[in-house]
């Protein structure tokens, strides 16, 4: 018997604001527990929330980038539930009138393009974080309480794990390149909930839905959905029934584990947030945001390949994150050859970042200095070998490449009037090499080049030496 899978995804993005959604508390990842929170986050009596306008601006950028319809009037609602990491016993979210609806993301899977539609996206506040100690105690950190989130809810249109992952990869790329979120899954800036049901092929009625919460990698999404497909098929083939439930993915076994069985959808008793008025979004503001949207990854990819002549692979490496792409763009804008800039970014720069477990913003290298160093190579001032020494200094200390080369006498000797007598002297002193060259032994050239490099302590420009050598040998 054949089965059809129906998959839906809910993705939470932590929006990149300096302060929280309803309070002035700062947002800093990794801060000491309970140092970035206040009475508004806790919902103390007499406190009132105030909406951070930047949250709406970032949310609108994502809405526009995903072709979503922006609702001109939105409002917040209370989602009522009790849990230790939720000190107010309710969450402020958007249930009845979300930020935007009816968008889509276009993906390509197995060589076929498909539009996966977005049901809606809404703004809400995050909860705190529970940590369960080995001493029998549980601890709550409220630093995350009130951090702004954008939840993007897909239509249940995906039919296999590959489609789900393709959608997530594309959505992550879109959100990252708007600048709305840093989408760092390891820091909780992007969190994924999935739901999947299966039914016999041809049956219109959907099967019973199983949810999986807080999956923290695309590979875990793929593995958990594939496992659920198989598990649910085996249940139906054996005459059983799939139960409405929430499960978690066990990374050690590669299986999903039951967390709780549900008798129906939870009743959170939503009602309009009484402390916040409706939020009106003016079309002029939407138009202004649309006009200033950053280039998407697809737009940048087209420029890199079609205009700069980069190979698609090199372009995709640069586009793995917005920070890298922005740095590359700035390097080219500073005058660097695009291909050389891509080569250095994808090899030496990325190698240094991996070695130091750092990001571009953490190191001393600037696009201007990288461009200056590339120009020193292009104009023959330094060799590729010397460039690596210059790069090591520049990336570590932010030293100006040109100044460093001048102060340390690292410039190549390219003056033909200076090198020509040296070439003649070396050729005159090595008649056997001349004879070998004339007899077709090209390795003789390498020996002669080596002798000249020895005389100049490695500073002679190899291209100029080769040119002069060939001219001298041809005249004999």
Swiss-Prot record:
One of its GO terms (molecular function) is ATP binding. GO terms for biological process: glutaminyl-tRNAGln biosynthesis via transamidation; translation. It is an enzyme of class 6 (ligase). Gene3D superfamilies: 1.10.10.410, GatB domain, N-terminal subdomain (1.10.150.380). SMART domains: GatB_Yqey. Keywords: ATP-binding, Ligase, Nucleotide-binding, Protein biosynthesis. InterPro entries: Asn/Gln-tRNA_amidoTrfase_suB/E (IPR017959), Asn/Gln-tRNA_Trfase_suB/E_cat (IPR006075), Asn/Gln_amidotransferase (IPR018027), Asn/Gln_tRNA_amidoTrase-B-like (IPR003789), GatB (IPR004413), GatB_C_1 (IPR042114), GatB_Yqey_C_2 (IPR023168), Gln-tRNA_amidoTrfase_suB_CS (IPR017958). Its EC number is 6.3.5.-. It catalyses: L-glutamyl-tRNA(Gln) + L-glutamine + ATP + H2O = L-glutaminyl-tRNA(Gln) + L-glutamate + ADP + phosphate + H(+); L-aspartyl-tRNA(Asn) + L-glutamine + ATP + H2O = L-asparaginyl-tRNA(Asn) + L-glutamate + ADP + phosphate + 2 H(+). It comes from the Bacteria. Heterotrimer of A, B and C subunits. Allows the formation of correctly charged Asn-tRNA(Asn) or Gln-tRNA(Gln) through the transamidation of misacylated Asp-tRNA(Asn) or Glu-tRNA(Gln) in organisms which lack either or both of asparaginyl-tRNA or glutaminyl-tRNA synthetases. The reaction takes place in the presence of glutamine and ATP through an activated phospho-Asp-tRNA(Asn) or phospho-Glu-tRNA(Gln). Belongs to the GatB/GatE family. GatB subfamily. This is Aspartyl/glutamyl-tRNA(Asn/Gln) amidotransferase subunit B. It comes from Lactobacillus delbrueckii subsp. bulgaricus (strain ATCC 11842 / DSM 20081 / BCRC 10696 / JCM 1002 / NBRC 13953 / NCIMB 11778 / NCTC 12712 / WDCM 00102 / Lb 14).
């Amino acid at each position: 018997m054949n089965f059809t899978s129906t998959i839906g995804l809910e993705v939470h993005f932590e929006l990149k604001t300096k302060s929280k959604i309803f309070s002035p508390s700062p947002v800093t990842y990794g801060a000491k527990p309970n140092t970035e929170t206040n009475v508004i986050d806790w919902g103390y009596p007499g406190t009132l929330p105030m909406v951070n306008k930047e949250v709406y601006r970032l949310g609108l950028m994502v809405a526009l980038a995903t072709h979503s319809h922006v609702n001109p009037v939105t409002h917040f609602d209370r989602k009522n539930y009790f849990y230790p990491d939720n000190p107010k016993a309710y969450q402020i979210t958007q249930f009845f009138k979300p930020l935007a609806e009816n968008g889509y993301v276009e993906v390509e899977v197995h060589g076929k393009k498909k539009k996966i539609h977005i049901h809606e996206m809404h703004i809400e506040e995050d909860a705190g974080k529970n940590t369960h100690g080995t001493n029998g105690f549980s601890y709550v950190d409220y630093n995350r309480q009130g951090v702004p989130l954008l939840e993007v809810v897909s239509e249940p249109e995906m039919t296999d794990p590959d489609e789900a992952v393709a959608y997530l990869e594309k959505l992550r790329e879109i959100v990252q390149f708007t600048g709305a979120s840093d989408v760092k899954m390891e820091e909780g800036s992007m969190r994924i909930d999935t739901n999947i049901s299966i039914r016999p092929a041809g049956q219109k009625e959907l099967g019973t839905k199983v949810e999986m919460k807080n999956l923290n990698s695309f590979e875990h999404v793929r593995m958990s959905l594939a496992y659920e497909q198989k598990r649910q098929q085996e249940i139906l083939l054996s005459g059983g029934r799939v139960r409405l439930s929430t499960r978690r993915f066990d990374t050690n076994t590669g299986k999903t584990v039951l967390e709780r069985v549900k008798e129906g959808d939870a009743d959170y008793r939503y009602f309009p947030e009484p402390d916040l008025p409706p939020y009106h979004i003016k079309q002029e503001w939407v138009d202004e945001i649309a006009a200033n949207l950053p280039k998407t990854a697809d737009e940048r990819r087209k420029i890199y390949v079609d205009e700069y002549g980069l190979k698609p692979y090199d372009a995709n490496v640069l586009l793995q994150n917005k920070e890298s792409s922005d740095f590359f763009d700035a390097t080219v804008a500073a005058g660097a050859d695009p291909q050389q800039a891509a080569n250095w970014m994808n090899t030496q720069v990325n190698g240094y970042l991996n070695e130091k477990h750092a990001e571009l913003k953490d190191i001393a290298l600037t696009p201007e200095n990288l461009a200056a160093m590339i120009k020193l190579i292009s104009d023959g001032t330094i060799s590729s070998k010397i460039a690596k020494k210059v790069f090591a200094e520049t990336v570590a200390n932010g030293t100006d490449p040109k100044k460093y080369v001048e102060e340390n006498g690292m410039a190549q000797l390219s003056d033909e009037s200076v090198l020509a007598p040296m070439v003649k002297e070396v050729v005159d002193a090595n008649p056997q090499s001349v004879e070998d060259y004339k007899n077709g032994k090209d390795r003789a050239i390498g020996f002669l080049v080596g002798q000249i490099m020895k005389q100049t302590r490695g500073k002679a420009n190899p291209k100029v030496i080769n040119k002069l050598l060939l001219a001298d040998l041809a005249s004999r």
